[in-house]
Swiss-Prot record:
<dbReference type="Pfam" id="PF01926">
    <property type="entry name" value="MMR_HSR1"/>
</dbReference>
<dbReference type="InterPro" id="IPR016496">
    <property type="entry name" value="GTPase_HflX"/>
</dbReference>
<dbReference type="InterPro" id="IPR042108">
    <property type="entry name" value="GTPase_HflX_N_sf"/>
</dbReference>
<keyword id="KW-0460">Magnesium</keyword>
<keyword id="KW-0963">Cytoplasm</keyword>
<comment type="subunit">
    <text>Monomer. Associates with the 50S ribosomal subunit.</text>
</comment>
<dbReference type="InterPro" id="IPR006073">
    <property type="entry name" value="GTP-bd"/>
</dbReference>
<comment type="function">
    <text>GTPase that associates with the 50S ribosomal subunit and may have a role during protein synthesis or ribosome biogenesis.</text>
</comment>
<keyword id="KW-0342">GTP-binding</keyword>
<feature type="binding site">
    <location>
        <begin position="309"/>
        <end position="312"/>
    </location>
    <ligand>
        <name>GTP</name>
    </ligand>
</feature>
<dbReference type="GO" id="GO:0005525">
    <property type="term" value="F:GTP binding"/>
</dbReference>
<feature type="binding site">
    <location>
        <begin position="244"/>
        <end position="247"/>
    </location>
    <ligand>
        <name>GTP</name>
    </ligand>
</feature>
<feature type="binding site">
    <location>
        <begin position="197"/>
        <end position="204"/>
    </location>
    <ligand>
        <name>GTP</name>
    </ligand>
</feature>
<feature type="binding site">
    <location>
        <begin position="222"/>
        <end position="226"/>
    </location>
    <ligand>
        <name>GTP</name>
    </ligand>
</feature>
<dbReference type="GO" id="GO:0046872">
    <property type="term" value="F:metal ion binding"/>
</dbReference>
<feature type="binding site">
    <location>
        <begin position="329"/>
        <end position="331"/>
    </location>
    <ligand>
        <name>GTP</name>
    </ligand>
</feature>
<dbReference type="InterPro" id="IPR005225">
    <property type="entry name" value="Small_GTP-bd"/>
</dbReference>
């Protein structure tokens, strides 16, 4: 196991204990032991070195004291800050984003997952090769270069940008294939339920408990990166597809969000979402709020059941309140029958047919309707485009609007 000095910049005293514990868990997952911890209270990072000058000197003394050559910073460094710290301290410096990327690289198993991780790492490293020009000799003209004046640094940058473009094209092709599979699932009429939650909340354990899937379930952060799809038959005989997704984390690095966009978007295919929360985590409320915020940002508009998992680890009973909430233990099976009942109650199994007139200005919706619902008929009228579609009520409400659903069926909002 690698050993490191861990350094934090404390911008928010209230959040610091939670952020500290989470970063130490990330390091443990990565296989790095925190030998010592140092922190500095500052409202904002110092532009050049992240920490103040005096604190940097103190960090250097601790590194020498413990004979360490690795500094792990519990925040995100700019390329300049990372370079300056490495030059001053003469050790390897890694930040929070880099640790997360290394964990992702270890846990990516599918072709898509590996592409996404490579894309994120290249986007992270591209701005960090700046400054290498001082130590790289200049190249003469040759194949792949633009002439005798091009440096190795410029060639490296160009190579990385080219690879990033290739990876983005590959991901686009994978996304198109996913859309084809999604259309087939829709034609089959099998509803989709997505498992989402903070990393290490127990989503994979729950997937295994419900379906016997045998998916890797470890007490590690980001143990699951690749979406896993499994069939589930409810007690009433209804069939559905259950999808496990990559775990969320507070302040998810933007480049990871971009690289894993297509994976995260899988929640938009779902008729129902199970938000799995680690009910025994002391920072449960903070983690729950992070996931809810991300779902809001993603404009998720389907029912969400909050599943408080790991309640068997609680020293004493806790009352979890909520209209769509259930406390369970995926490990022991506690309350799993109640969870299945809630899934049945919240999924609208009956397929309905809706006829609605769209204004011509909303003609762009036709593509979404064809892709996500059964488009039975389409007719152009003087007042707009009349469409007849069939599908689950919630999905129709999502793409046509609940008002259109109510007008067509004479129903009240659910």
């Amino acid at each position: 196991m690698e050993k490191a000095l861990v350094a934090f910049l404390v911008e928010n005293l209230k959040k610091f204990p939670y952020q500290k514990e989470e970063f130490l868990a990330l390091l443990k997952t990565r296989g790095i032991e925190a030998v010592d911890i140092i922190s500095q209270r500052l409202e904002h990072p110092v532009p050049a070195t992240y920490f103040g000058y005096g604190k940097v000197q103190e960090i250097g003394e601790l590194l020498k004291k413990h004979n360490l050559n690795l500094l792990a910073v519990g925040g995100d460094l700019t390329p300049t800050q990372a370079k300056n710290l490495e030059e001053i301290l003469e050790v390897t410096v890694v930040d929070r984003t880099q640790i997360i990327l290394e964990i992702f690289a270890e846990h990516a198993h599918t072709h898509e997952g590996k592409i996404q991780v490579e894309l994120a790492r290249l986007m992270y490293n591209l701005p960090r090769i700046t400054g290498l020009g001082r130590v790289l000799s200049r190249l003469g003209g040759g194949i792949g270069t633009r002439g005798p004046g091009e440096t190795k640094l410029e060639v490296l940058r160009r190579t990385i940008r080219k690879r990033i473009a290739e990876l983005r094209r590959e991901l686009k092709e994978i996304e198109q294939n996913r859309k084809v599979k999604r259309s087939r699932r829709l034609e089959a009429g099998v509803p989709i339920v997505a498992l989402v939650g903070y990393t290490n909340a127990g989503k994979s354990t729950l997937l295994n408990a419900l379906t016997g899937a045998g998916v890797l379930a470890e007490d590690k952060l980001f143990a699951t990166l690749d979406p896993t799809v499994r069939k589930l038959t409810l007690p009433g005989g209804q069939k559905l597809l259950l999808i496990d997704t990559v775990g969320f984390i507070e302040n998810m690095p933007p480049l990871i969000k971009e690289a894993f966009k297509s994976t995260l978007e899988v929640v938009h295919e779902a008729e129902l979402i199970l938000h799995v929360v680690d009910g025994a985590n002391p920072y449960r409320e903070e983690q729950e709020a992070v996931v809810e915020k991300i779902l809001t940002e993603m404009k998720v508009r389907v029912p969400v059941i909050t599943v408080y998992n790991k309640v068997d680890l609680l020293p004493e009973p806790v009352l979890f309140l909520g209209k769509r909430a259930v406390a369970i233990s995926a490990r022991t099976g506690y309350n799993m029958e109640l969870l299945l009942k809630l899934i049945e109650e919240n999924l609208f199994w009956q397929e309905v047919t809706v006829k609605a007139v769209l204004p011509f200005a909303q003609a762009f919706k036709i593509g979404d309707l064809k892709e996500n619902l059964k488009l039975i008929n389409l007719e152009y009228l003087p007042e707009g485009i009349e469409v007849t579609v069939a599908g689950p009520r919630e999905r129709i409400a999502r793409y046509l609007g609940r008002e259109k659903l109510e007008e067509s069926n004479g129903e009240k909002p659910v």
